[in-house]
Every structure is written in structure tokens, then in C-alpha cells.
Amino acid sequence: MPSDCGDDDHGGGSAPAGFELQEDPSFWKDNNVQVVIRVRPLSSGEISVQGQKRCVRQDSCQSITWTGHPESRFKFDLVADEYVTQENLFKVAGVPMVDNCMAGYNSCMFAYGQTGSGKTHTMLGDIENGTRRNNVNCGMTPRVFEHLFLRIQKEKEIRKEEKLRFTCKCSFLEIYNEQILDLLNPNSVNLQIREDAKKGVHVENLTEHEVSNAREAMQQLVEGAANRKVAATNMNRASSRSHSVFTCLIESKWESQGINHHRFSRLNLVDLAGSERQKSSGAEGERLKEATNINKSLSTLGLVITNLIAVSNKKSHHVPYRDSKLTFLLQDSLGGNSKTTIIANISPSSCCAAETLSTLKFAQRAKYIRNNAIINEDASGDVLSMRLQIQHLKKEVSRLQGLVNSDKAECTSSSGFICESPSTLKWNQGQGSFSPLMFDKRAMQRKDYDAALVAAFRREQETEAKLKAMIAAKLVAEQLATQRAEEVRSFKMRLRFREDRIKRLEQVTSGKLSAESHLLQENEDLVKEVDALRGLLDRNPEVTRFAMENLQLKEDIRRLQTFVDEGEREMMHEQIIVLQDKLLEALDWKLMHEKDPINKDLSFLGESADEEMEFIRLQAIQNEREIESLRKNLSFCLESKEKLERRVDELTLELEAAKKYHEESEAVELQVQTEVDLHDLPDAQTELKTLVDAIATASQREAEAHETAIGLAKANEELRTRLTVLIEDNKRLVELYEHAIANGEVNQDGGHPAIPQIEGVNEQQSSHSYGGAAANGVLPDDKPESATILPADNSSSEVSDSKIMDGQCNHKDNFSRSELTDLQLQLDEMHEENDKLMGLYEKAMQERDEFKRKFFEGSNSLTTVDTQYEDVEMRDATDDEDLEVKHVHDSAISTFKEILRLVRVKLKNVHDKLVTTQDAVEYFKLLEMASTKAEELSASIQHHCLELKHDQEDMNALKAELSQSQESKEALESKYFSPVASCWNLDLKTKALVGSKFDVSLELLNQKKEQLSHLQTLKKEFSVASTKARESETALRSKIDGLKVKLRSFEAQRKEAERVLFAIDNIDTSTPTLSKPVNFGKASELLRSEEERTKLLSELKKSREQLIMVQKEIKSMNRHDDIDCKIASLESEVENCCLTLLEADVEKFVRDNTLTEIWKEEQKDMDCLLVDYQECVFKVNLKEEKIRACEESLQHQTRSLDDMNSKLNQAMRDLGEHLRDRTPCDLDASMLHVSDKVKGDLDAMALHVAEAVQLLLVQGENQTNP
């Protein structure tokens, strides 16, 4: 299929030539997210708007370039061009996903892209016909379920012994306007999403149906798809207005080696609604609301992916899954426990360049998501492994007990040796293993064991502490997540309050709502908002931070406590060592006094051996089971290998067939270029008609030549049959002749009875030959040229046969029209020669009949001669002249022998000519076969030419009907859409007038409101500042008054002090010891009062200055009294603007009513027109499909006609080679054809037979006339 290409001076790319998708089997081992880009073909609407201009260029099967300014190159896991079929895409993306589900991984696949980019076609496709093999447009979801249940069936067959059981449950939901709807139960609406530890994220009360095969799953899919919200927009006639999620829960249970396994996985197939722009889609009313919700959820999806990338880079800690129902439901698929495939659908058209770039960027971000996929499997009842573990533990306990006992014995013996008791020394000499050196070594080993035990205890405690800390952190994190969700909910509530407030203000502005009701609702909303803020305050982020710090401090305290406890643990460890030493001494003493320790040791060894044997037996059983499982796996692998090899062979054959078909299609396209383009269709039709006429003319001519050749071949076949009969007659004649010779020899020895019979036969032959010769005008003594030429031709016939075979094998020249004319002339000549040959054959048959007649007459005459001879002999017996008669009889016998010799020579020549004639018959057989083949091919060509002509006429008639249907369609379309266009134009005109007035009024209103708010703010600021200034003035005045009072009091005190000092100075100084301290205290008091007075004066001065400044400010504020006037004027202007807006709204309402009435009047007639228009569209589509089918049939017939023409040319070349090779090339001989040779041979045969007959007749006459 040729690729569409378009050139663009501004970066328009061209269509790629097509890249083969390659599956990587090891991809899912290292990755959990796969991103696939799928490019859809250009639509007819895009071609009509932008032509073949493209905005993307594919570089390989993993890279694509956006050809805008500047160019951007993107690399993904797979890039599928517009030529990739649904089957190929499923093999590289759908099959691995099913395999992951069967292995126990959660899997998810969703399609992303703008509206009309092919998401629903990719995910669902044509689901009306189910999962039939011939349905090439079947999407991912049906193919996934078909492959899934095939895998389940194979797993059941392979693992029959494990009692494998599968259970599949399907559910189908859609998210429409942020509400979850159950597509399998339309009565269930507005379902809720729940999350718990057991089920994870799930939808409450969602319908689940258990399915057992692909047909039942498809039935659920079709039933749910029929309930899905779909509407038409400017960009897509069947645009999905919701997100759909088809979920399949797969559970499997089996038993293996005493273990009950339970594996489960979840498969999500998501079809997202397309992002769209209001300008491009023309969404209004309900469609606009749907588009808003769709874009909101898709933007949340992009935000979630961005935050996931940030989390993987340790730059963020929060992912807003709960901001939309879609992301909350797909929480596990995005950054969770799942293997996810994202198929980003894009349009290559230049008119969708911005949307395509946005989709490519989204897919590039999605490549960096990191999921943590694990196998969901549980196991229970592992009895055998538990028994093995028990045996291991028993053996380990026995070994440790033995070590402990030996250490205790050594410690006891060592202590006894130190005490130097005689019994102990004697026992040590007998054992020879409890020396002081060995004691030190075992003591060191014991310390090592103790240290290892202590370390194990410590690790166990640390693990328990960490586990508790993690559990506490998890609980805190869950609480924090709950708090964060509540915060988000409160913020949304506040946002909703604000939106409602804005709407009410708009209603108050437009006069639809009174001020009192507005204030009441405002008060209620404010109360609710205050409650929400209080709740938010209770869940303050600072509280969260403090809680986390509290946990951190608790962890630090635990670590410190661990360090403190280690000292106590060391003390306890020392105590345990001391106790162990004492225990060892006691055991050593007990061991020394036991009578038969060896028997106990042997019994202990026997028990340990029995336990070890039991352990070995269990281990052997385990090994046998493992070997059996490995054998099963090996057989399964071998079967899989054989299946893969068979599949590879099948694919190789399919590839070869595809290549062959591709080459044939290219050859046909080079010979007959019948393009579907309507602009070039008339020229292509003219060329095709000319070619068909030329082929028909050539075929007719060849047919005439073939008919001539076929007639000649039939005549040759009849001649060959007659020649065969003649040869048989000749053989019978030769046998009769030989029998006559044998009888003659016998009679020569014993008498003369056979002579009359031989003479009769000769007479019959000579009469037959003579008659034949006379009939052909040939005298007995004449020898025609053919008698001398034919022997040479007999030798050259073998050379001619070899030339024929060489010509059939080596002749490679093309058969031209001139050669066809020459062959036709040669065939005409051979036909004439064949007629001559048939005449000769009829003459030969007449001669044979005459020969038979004369043969019977001769036999009768010989009978009478016999009787005469008997009478003569009887007379001669009695006569004395016996000797003379005997002499005459001997001379007659010698003459008869000579005649027989000549007849034998003639018959031998006849036999040779018959052999040559048989070669000619074989040649005629070859000619007949070649001509028959040519006749069949000619008849087939004529039949195909007639069919081709008939199909061409049908296609022309269909095209005429198509043009008529298109004209009627255009007429109905113009008639149907003209009222819409008129209403639309009227709407645009009135909307422009009213809209401009409304926009100007609204802009002016906003400006006035801003000025009014600014002036009101200034007024409030001035009033607040004035109030503060007056308050400060009052405070300063009161302060000044207080300072003046204090100053007066200080003045009075100062005067009193001066008076006292003056009085003291006037007192008698007779008592100086008492007056000095009093004077000093008064003076210091006076100084202090003076200082305080100075301070008061400075403070008073400062307060007065501040008072002057405040008074100046108050005076300056009093100058802004004109603000109230400005505010009043602006309020009046705002009221005028509101009235203007109301007028514009009324005009808009009147305009809408007018348009509605006009539309209702026009809509009455549009229903009938719509039915006619749809019927006309259906007819046009039907005619186009028929024309396409006719064109395909014409192409197929043209290819068949070319093949038959080539075969016919080859057959004609073979026939021409036969004719040319049989024509002699010797210039000395006459240019004779094969029929001439046969004629000459027959003439020679007739001559020889005539001569033989003549000889026999002469002999007979001599005998009859003695």
C-alpha cells in the first residue's frame, strides 16, 4: 500500500515508509511501565483542510520527531505507524500483558490522546462481530480475553495433576462528570470508591459477573459499551464523553507438594475520554460541561504523573490521587503494584500539531513512572517443608547439646586437675583429651557461642523495635493522609463557598436576587466557612510536624535506652558465665561417677543416626518430587519448543507468500495503474478501455489461428488412427505371406499342392496393387521421386525430433505479432497438405478393399486349378510321358521362388515406409497437444475479456449512479444546512452587536467598580487614620495636662525646699554636728527635684511638638472631604452600567427567543430532509463500496488475463518451434512439410504393393495359360 506523503515548507513531515514492530521478550523483566505511541491515518476531513501535511516524522520503531518549530525528537518503547494492524499491536503489547496476568501480576492498559485520535478503536475496535478470526478491526480488549482464555485452557491441560482451578470475574464502569456509573447495571449510579487493607482501592456495590470463556466476557463488554455515553462533536462523530474501565479479576488455585497455592491478579483495560478544546470541538451546553470535567480529570492525571516523577527523584512526598475519581481508581496502576501499558494515540495532521505535541510530552513523562509490581500469591499447608525444618532443628539441637556436654565435661575435668585429686588425674590419663590447653580452647569456643547468642538476641530485639516503630510510623502516616484528605475536602468546600458567593453577587448585580436574601445566605456560608477553618486549624500542619518530631524523639530515646541497657546486659552476661562454670563442675563430677558412659554415648549416637536417616529419607522424597517437577517442566519446554518451531515455519511460509503477493501486486500496479482518485479516474478509464480492446483484438486473432491448428490436429489424429489400422493390415499380410512361403517350401519337398494357393495370394496382392497404382496414375514401372527422397527423410526425422526437443527446452524468445502471422500461414499450408493426405489415405483404403476382393477370387481359382492338376497327374501316372511334365513343373517352381523373393523385398520396403509414417504420426500428436493447449488458453482469454468488459460496464454504470447520488446528496445537504447557516449567521450578527455592547458595558462597570473600591478603601484608610490621629491628639493633650500638673507640684516642692534651706541657713550654728546631715539631705532632694523638673520640661516640649504634628495631619485629612462626592458619583455610574448590562441581557434573551422560534419553524421541515439525507448518504457509501469491489475484481481479472496471455504466448512459441523444426533446411532437397513426407511414403508403399501384386498376377497368368 503506498504511503501518503505531503510536503510543507514550514516543517511538514512526510508519511513514513512503515517500520516493523519488534517484540522484546525480556522487556517486562526489567520494567513495569511500557509506553507505546500509535499514529492513526489522516482522515478525509483533515485532508480536505490541510491536505497531506504532517506534523510528525517517524525515524524508527522506537523514535518519532515532531516537525514543528523547533523540532522535538522523542524516544519510546514502541512507535506504531498508521500501517500497523490491530493484530500486530496486540502481539507486541497485549500478549505480554496477558502473560503477566497469568504469572500473578496486576496489569493495566489505557489509551490516552486527544478526541478523535483512535483511542476507542485501539481499545475496543469493532466489537459487533465478536472475536472472529476474520475480524481484523477487533480491538485490544476482545483480543486480550480471547488470548487469556486460551492460556487458561492450556494451563489446565498442562497442569492436570495439580488440580488447577481458575475463576474470572468481570466488571465494567464509566466515570461521567466525576460520577461513577455501573455499565452492567444502569440503575446503579454515583457509586463510591473505598480503600481498605484487604481489597485495596475498589468501587463499592459494583456489579461483578463470573465468566468462563471469551464469548461470555465479550457479551459483558458489548452490553456495557451499549450503555456508555457517546455524543457527536466537530472533531469526532462518536466521541466518548466518559472514561471507561473494564476490570477482570483472575484467581487461580492449585496444590503442589502438599502446599495449597492461591494466586490472584487484576486486569484493568481503560479507555480514556479525549482531551478537547472548545474552539475546535464546538462544545456547548451539556457537551461543554462534559468537556470541562474530562479536561479536569486528565489534567489531574498529568499532575499525578509529574508528582510521581518527583517522588522517584526524592523531590516531593505527596501525590494527589484523590483529586479526581480516575486517578484514585488507578492508584495501583500509577506508581503502585501493577505492570502498566500506556498507548498514546496521536493524529499526524498539521491541524492537530499542538495536541500531538502535548500528547507526546505526556507520554514522555509517563516513561519515568516507577511501579513496584509483585506476584500476588499465598501458600498454606506446607507440611513437608515444616517436617524438614523440624528435622533440621532437631539435628542442630542435638549437635549443640553435644558441644555443651563436652564443654561441661572439659570444665569439670580441668577444675579437678587443678585440685589435683587422684581420681581425676587417673581419669585424665585414661581419656587423654581434657588437658589445660584443650580446656582453654573450648572455653574460647564457649565464649564465641555466647557472643553469637547475645548478638542474635540483640538483632532480634532491634528488629522488633524497628517493626514497632514502622507500625507506629505507618499509623501516623495514615492519620496524616486522612488529615490531608480532610484538608483537601475543606479547601474544596471553601472553594465551593466562594463560587456560590460569586454567583450570588452576580445575581445581586443583575437584580435577580435581593440584598436581604443575599446577606442571609452570605451569613450562613460564612458560618460554615468558619467551622471549616476551625477544623483546619485543629489539623494544622504544625501539629503534623510536631507529631513527626515526637516520633523522631521517641526513636532517639529508644536508641539511648538501648545503649544504657547494654551495660546491664554485660553484667547479666558475666553472671551467666559464672553460673555456667558452676554447672559444668557439677556435671563433670556426675560424669566421673557414672558407671557406663560409653553405652549412653552409643545410645545417643544411635538416636542421632536414626534422626539423621529420617531426615535423609525426607530429603530424598523432596528430591524425587523436585525431579518429577523438573521432568514436567522439561517436557513442557520441549512441547513449547516444537510449537514455536512449527509457528516459525508457518510464519516463514506466510512471509514468503506475502512477499510473492507483494511482488505480484507491484507488477500489476506497474502494468495497470488504476488509482481510486476521482480526479484522475477518467484518464485511467480511457487507458484501461484501450488496453482491454487491444487485448480482445489480439485474443480474437490468436483464437482464429488456434482454431485452424486445432482442426489440423484433429485431422492428423484421424490420419494417425487410419495409419495404425493400415499397419495392422500390413502385418497380417506379411504373416500370411510368410505362411505361404513356409507351405511352398514344404510342397517343394513333397509335391505341388500349395502352388495354386500362393499364386492366388499373389494374384490378389498384384490385383490390389495394380488397382491402387492405376487409381493414382502410376504405372508399375514408374518410380516417383518420393521413392528416392523418403529414405533420406527417414534418417532426418530423428534429427528433426531432437531439434523439436531442443527448441522446447532452449527457446526463450518472446512471441511477437509477426511470428504469429507466419505461424498462421504455415498452419494454412499444413491444412491444405492434410486434405491431400486424407485423399491419399482414402485411395489406399479403396485399394485395400480391392485387394481383399481379388484375394478371395484368386483362392477360388486356385481350388479349380488344384482339381485339374490332380486329373493330369492321374493321367500322367498311366501315361508314359511323365518325364516331360515333371520338367515343366520344376521350371515353374523356380520361377515362383524368384517371384516370392521380389515380393518379400517390396513388402520390406513397405514396412520401412510404415515406420517413417509412424514418426510423422508422433509429430502430429505433439502438434495436436500444443494446439489443444492454445485453444483452451484462447477460450479462457476470451471468457476473461468478456467478464472484464462486463465488469467495466458495471463500474461505469455504478460511477454514473454515484455521481447522481452525490449530486442529490449535495442538494439535500445544502437544503438541509441552509436554515442552520442562516440561523447561525443571524446569531453571529446579533451576538456581535449585543456582545460588543455587553462587553463595553461590562468593562466600564468593572472599571467603575475598581475605582469605587479604591475610593472606598481610601475613605476607610482616611477615616481610620483620622480616628487614630484624634485619639493620639486626645492622648497627647491629656499627657500634657498631666505633665503640667507634675511640673506645678515639682515647682511647689522646689520652692518649699528652697524655703527650708534658707531657713536652715539662718539658724544658729551652735550645734554644727546636727545641722550638717539635715542640710545635705535637703540639698540632694532639691537636686533630684531639679533633674526631674528638667525631664518633665523636655517631655512636655516633646509632647507639644507631637501634638502640633497630629493637628497638622488632622488638618490635611480634613482636606479630603471630596472623596464622598466622588464615591456618590461612582455609585450612580455603577447603577447606570448595571442597567445597561440588564438591557443587553434582555436583548440577548429576545434574540435567543427569536432564533428559537425561527429554528422551530425550520425544524418542522428538517426531519423529513434528515431522513432523505441519511438515505442518500447510505446510497453514496454503498455505491462507493461497490465501485471499490469492482475495481478490485478488475485488477484481479487483469492479472489473470496477463498470466493467461503469457501462457498463450509460450504455447504459440512451442507450436512455432514444432513447425520450424520439422521444415527441412537442405537447399538441395525440395522444401517439403511433414504431410509431403507422409504422402511420399504412402506413394512409395502403393508402388511397392502394386509391383508385388503385378508379379503375382503375372505368375498367376502364366500358370493359368501354360
From Swiss-Prot:
The UniProt record lists the keyword Transmembrane helix: no
Positions annotated to bind ATP: G113, Q114, T115, G116, S117, G118, K119, T120
GO cellular component terms given for this protein: microtubule; spindle
UniProt-recorded Gene Ontology molecular function terms: ATP binding; microtubule binding; microtubule motor activity
Chain segments annotated as transmembrane: none
Keywords on record: ATP-binding, Coiled coil, Microtubule, Motor protein, Nucleotide-binding
Any Gene Ontology biological process: spindle assembly
Keyword Nucleotide-binding assigned: yes
Similarity comment text for this entry: Belongs to the TRAFAC class myosin-kinesin ATPase superfamily. Kinesin family. KIN-12 subfamily.
Name of the protein this chain belongs to: Kinesin-like protein KIN-12G
Lineage of the species this protein comes from: Eukaryota, Viridiplantae, Streptophyta, Embryophyta, Tracheophyta
